[in-house]
Each structure stands twice: as C-alpha cells, then as structure tokens.
C-alpha cells in the first residue's frame, strides 16, 4: 500500500491427522510450490526447535532437510523464544485496527485461518483460549482453535520485528 506494507496470507497447509507431521507438510509444500519458486522462508513456533520422543530430528531440522533445495542462509525466520502472547495479540489487533503501517490480508481460500481468526477467544488471563476437543474417529484430543492464528502471529512479529519491538517497549 502507499503508506505501509501488506502482509498477505494467500495459502495454508492445515493437514488433518495422521498427516499433520513436518514431513507431510514439507511434501505438500513441495508438491504445490516446488517447481514454482526459487527460495523459501519459514516461520513458526519456537517449540519446533525441540526434539520430540517421536523423532531424532526437531521439526525445523526436518524442514531444513526436506526443503534444502529452496533454502538459503536467511531462510530460517523462527525464533528461539515465542513472542509474549498478550503483546503479540495487542500488536496484531493494532494492525487490524489500522494503527500501524502494516495491513493483514487473508485470502478467503485460507478457510482454517479465517475460522481461527473468527472464533478464537481470549482466556481470563488475556491469552488465547485453546479449547480442547476430541476427534471422534481417532480419539485424539487437540486444540480446536489457535494454531493457524499462532502461525500468523509468529510470522508477522518476525516480518515486522522492528515495529513489534518498538510496540513492546512502548
């Protein structure tokens, strides 16, 4: 835009269980964009740097291994610590309210993001209320809302890092 920057969420990959793994995510990205882009950046939750009991690699090591062809020295845009929830909530709300030089555009095709941004609620502590629900088929419990909006938060707080830092100080 003339007076600022547009941040556009033009696609999403919200893979259902049992395909909601780092490997399957990378495969889906490669299938859709592998022959159409020269480089990629990745953003996300700081917990992706931690090893799980399921794998010898962290989620981000899997991403780096599988997307190596499209990555360069500056591709990893993840943080070692997540931005504070309340600060990032207020910063994102300021963007939506037009109080910053940034503008967030979410394509209607990003259905999970639209649903998440529409229905996520605030808990009594000012954080995101991560309602737990149980999948009727698998029996697994998961958070109904919050993952898509968290991913947007992490990306925006990193892309707009200097503005976010000033906001937090201010």
Where do the model's predicted regions map?
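Mg2+-dependent endonuclease catalytic cores in nucleic-acid-processing enzymes, primarily RNase H-like
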Residues: 3-137, 162-163, 170
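Acidic, Mg2+-coordinating catalytic module of metal-dependent nucleases/exonucleases
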Residues: 138-168
């Amino acid at each position: 835009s003339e007076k600022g920057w547009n941040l556009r969420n033009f696609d999403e990959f919200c893979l259902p269980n049992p395909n909601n793994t780092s490997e399957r995510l990378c495969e889906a990205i490669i299938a859709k964009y592998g022959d159409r882009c020269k480089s990629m950046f990745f953003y996300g939750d700081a917990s992706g740097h931690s090893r799980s009991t399921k794998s010898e690699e962290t989620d981000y090591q899997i991403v780096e291994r599988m997307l190596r062809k499209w990555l360069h020295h500056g591709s990893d845009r993840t943080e070692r610590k997540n931005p504070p929830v309340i600060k990032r909530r207020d910063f994102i709300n300021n963007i939506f309210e037009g109080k910053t030089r940034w503008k967030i555009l979410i394509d209607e095709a990003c259905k999970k993001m639209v649903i998440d941004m529409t229905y996520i609620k605030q808990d009594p502590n000012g954080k995101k209320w991560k309602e737990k629900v149980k999948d009727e088929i698998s029996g697994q419990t998961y958070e109904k809302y919050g993952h898509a909006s968290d991913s947007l938060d992490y990306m925006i707080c990193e892309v707009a890092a200097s503005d976010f830092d000033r906001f937090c100080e201010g």
